[in-house]
Amino acid sequence: FTKNLQRQLRGESARAWPERREDGTRPVVVRKGRENYLCLLNLEDAMQGGFGGRAAILAQMVARWAAYSRDGDMIGGDLPGWLGTLFRKRGIAALTDQRGECVYAGCPHYRKCFIERAARASAQADLVIANHALVMVNAARGRDAAQRPTRIVFDEGHHVFDAADSTFAAALTGQEAIELRRWIVGPERKSKGRRRGLAARLADVASYDEAGGEAVEAAIEAARHLPSDGWLGRINEGEPYGPLENLFSAVRALTFARDESGGQEAGYGIETEIADLPGQLIELAQQAASALSAIRHPLVKLGVRLEAVLEDAPDWLDGPGRARIEGARHSLGWRVDLLAAWEALLERLGGPADPEFVDWFAVDRSDAREFDIGIHRRWLDPMKPFAKVVLEPAHGVMLTSATLTDRTDEGADWEDAITRSGAPHIEVAPLTTAAESPFDYTARAEVLIVTDIKRGDLPALAGAYARFIEAAGGGVLGLFTAIRRLRAVYGRIADRLARSGLPLYAQHVDPIDTGTLVDIFRDDRTASLLGTDALRDGVDVPGESLRCVVLEGVPWPRPTILHRARRAAGGGSRHDDRIIRARLAQAFGRLIRGKDDKGHFIVLSPAFPS
């Protein structure tokens, strides 16, 4: 949600701070997650034969760009958003640090590293602009406690709950398990690339410290029981290998057996509650837990040995070597915590449910193709860990948003906003303040509710969108609650509009990142843009380019297992109504971005409770 907001803040901050201080440092720094930045070691590997064919051309173009880039940000930065779409899907991702494989000071590019430069610059800055998830991940896993910010402002504060929800989640899935295997064992023999297992990364330590070497060997041997390449194919053919693949196979079978959609949701993931489990599945879960425990113990032992090597350092251990071992220790700690969370999740399968958590099985699918199977756990109230990890150590935290409070007939509902801020968990009474909007919505906006388009009538829905776009002469933002309907409407009307000189762009159809799509939309007043949730929040298109927002239906929350649990805890239909009101307010907020803006807000719903 926040890429557009980060660009906006970077532009606005230029009015308050100079580009650089007298000593050359930047007072304002944009900081993103590691997976957004170009990794120079991955680029070097790609240039030296890691990428072949068309992908090698991408590597050459990225190398040219890297020489001139402001900060090396490949996702939503100054790399053209369309470039990656001309090459294979994973091309851009393969050049970033997606998998926690960084060797820190052991890297020959450490001093020039874009990620490290951003981290060093943010330590000196007055203002660090980052997204919610990065702030939480750094608080939970940051290497240097002294560098953590003490005063935090969460803009778009209504997203903090969702960001905390995903940050403090646990998921034991096939994809996560195979990543752990690759981190410990290294890549499969036939794969290219510079990925190394533990043995290669810590070869010098293993040869110097016998106990450390034995721990590395034990961890690698135990990790061979994790899923390997081709695991999904083996499960689909009924031939799983190893304790975890056996477990995922049983999870998949049970999830399909309990699927209540009757094949209606063939293109989407399916899930089932963890209740009344067959004895065989519980037995498989215990075997999988033993396999995970066999990996965790040598990793803990290895962490202790690395600490001992640092304390009683040998003569050959220079500065970069010490930093590399520090980095390895940090990465080990993260994996040990992950394994402990997975073991706790598996122990729960045979026992009573924990009222603080919501657990479920899921088979993830995209366009009817399975891509992951696993066991998921979320906090019922994710603000509890958020309060402990982020709020408690901070000196001051501010949450700001136009939709923090729910608007009811009695006025603003501060009680719910305070609950969702996490403040009650640290027993602090927060200060609250509200400001009136500077815009005259009554005079500048008109709301239309269209009730004669039946739900599921795609030809009528597409016809309505085409008529609205033609009547407005472009400048329409269309928001959908389902990707399938978005694609169907786009397919029916794009040609018709193009013939009228009205270009139409769509998320999930045009292979361009959302930030670039919004830039194209902003620059062409005849263009229209169709999108989903990500466009409902944080998109800033002032002026003539956005004159009409069309909502394809009431934005009901999806009735997932997690949503049902929170709905039961949060007051039933009141909980749903609160979510819908906030989503409508956010969607309406896209329309009026300045005092001269005006336009229409249209909802297409036969059952809209107006």
Give residue spans per PLM region:
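Conserved RecA-like ASCE P-loop NTPase motor core of nucleic-acid helicases/translocases
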Residues: 1-2, 398-400, 475-486, 603-604
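A substrate-engagement module of RecA-like helicase motors
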Residues: 3-126, 182-256
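A contiguous, basic/glycine-rich beta-loop/short-helix subdomain that forms a polymer-engagement track
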Residues: 93-123, 136, 141-143, 302, ...
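Residues immediately C-terminal
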Residues: 135, 159-162, 166, 405, ...
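SF2 helicase catalytic motif II
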Residues: 148-168, 172
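Conserved RecA-like P-loop NTPase helicase motor core
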Residues: 441, 446, 450-456, 509-608
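Conserved interdomain hinge at the start of the Helicase C-terminal
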Residues: 449-481
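Conserved helicase motor "Helicase C" RecA-like lobe of SF1/SF2 P-loop NTPases
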Residues: 483-508
